[in-house]
Structures are given as C-alpha cells and as structure tokens.
Amino acid sequence: MQAQLKTKLAVFMFLQYFIWGSWYVSMGTYLSKTLQFEGAQIGLAYGAFAIGAMIAPFLVGLLADRYFASEKLLAFLGITGGLMLFALPMMTTFSSFYPMLIIYCCTFVPTLALGNSLSLRHLDNQKRDFPLVKTLSSIGWIAAGITLSVVFKGEQSAVQFYVAGTTSIIFGLFSLTLPHTPPMKTGKDVSMSEILGLDALALLKKPSFAIFILCMFLICIPLYFYFVNMNQYVTELGWEFSAAKMSLAQVSDVVFLILLPVMLSR
C-alpha cells in the first residue's frame, strides 16, 4: 500500500510543479515581447504570486481543516486554476491580466501546502520517504521547461498558459485518486488569530526556526530578480531553449532532496 501511495504522491508532485514551471520562468518574456508590458508591470505581475501566498492559504487552510477533505479541495483548486490559465491569454492589457493572475495564484499557492500536508499525513516514514517523493517536484519543473522550450518553443507565446492549464486540470482530476484526507478540526471553534496564522508565530521562539525563516526571507529577494529578469535577458542574448536551460538549475534540488533522508537519519 505504501509503494502505491508513494507512486501517487510522486505523480502528484510532478504535475503540481509542471504547472508552475510551465509559465513562471518565461512569463516575463511573454509579457515583455508579446504584450509589450512595461518593466514595472512585469514586476507587479510576478508579485501576484506573493499576494496569492499571503491571502489564499488562510482561507483554504481553514476550509481544509474544518469543512472539506484535502483531496477534494485540491481537485477543485486544480480544475478552477486550469480554467483561469486558459483565460489568461485573452487578457491582453495589464488592467485585465493582473487581476486574473492574482486570482489564479490564489488557487495555485494553497495546493503547495495542502499537498505537503496530505503527503506527511499518510506516509509512514516521513523523514525517509517525503524527500524522495518531493524529488519529483523538481523533475516536474525541469520537464515543464524542456516541454515549453523544445516541444513548443513557447517562451514568447501564450502556449505556456495552455500547457499549464491543461496540466492543472489533469492535476485536479488526479487529486481525486489520492487517499481520503478528512478535515481534522471539524466542529471546533475558529479564532481570528488562527485564521490569520498568528498562532504559527510562536514557532519563531525556536532559534533554529527563526534563523531558517530569516534565511528564506533573504534568499527570496535575489530569487525574484532572477525569475523576473533572467529569461528576458538570455532571450535578448539570443539563447535558444532558454526556459529549458534555466530549468536545469533544479538539478541541484534533485541531488539535495535525494541526500536529505541520509542527512536526517544522522
């Protein structure tokens, strides 16, 4: 049973990051070259993901904790997000594209935490098995870049959103095959601090966790410069298959995720 479960979770992770990798790396080039957006507008578009990360998890986390099974919520978010991705190419002005992108990000970002939570809840040996399952997320990102670049040559076209949208709908349907994961806090009172995630701030009292959060905060600053500008830059330099080449950076993720169970066992 665990072998079948790990296979399903690995496929789930692959699809999830294939969606993300299909559009996130090359969107800046599409917005710049095809829609002729200005630099500030492109920066705001990439900020939509951060807005989704700040808004959506609180509401979706509340729904998953108290009202809906995680796999059904993942299915709804995946299918809804897929339809929004199909709609994005129709939005050719910033005033229409940007709000739609924010709404889409509010459907995708919560799937990251929900998927991790579901996986950790069902795996018997989380320290050994979760990093190996998670390895498929990096492989999915790499596969998305290669597919977009080599198969579709789509860095500058709307095809990236169609690829991501199709995969998102498949992801949503596949989520229904995951183990039933009912809400754990049904019938319990809801506090405002819990909805806003303020209870989690208590974790910052642990020095190791506080240092980890600080490091992640600092790392994400240059990371966004990379995602917003890198694909446009190398495209201007005349690189072919730029999204595919950039995706190969995830090879380091694969290596370290494979090594993580060994490190955790020591």
What are the residue ranges of the model-derived segments?
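Cytoplasmic helix-loop-helix junction between adjacent transmembrane helices
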Residues: I102-L136
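Juxtamembrane intracellular "pre-TM" segments in multi-pass secondary transporters
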Residues: M1-A3, L178-L214
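Helix-to-loop junctions at the C-terminal end of transmembrane segments
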Residues: I55-A69, F152-K153, F256-R266
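Symmetry-related core transmembrane helices of the 12-TM Major Facilitator Superfamily/SLC fold
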Residues: Q160-T177
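Helix-loop boundary and gating motifs at the non-cytosolic
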Residues: Q2-A50, S208-L248
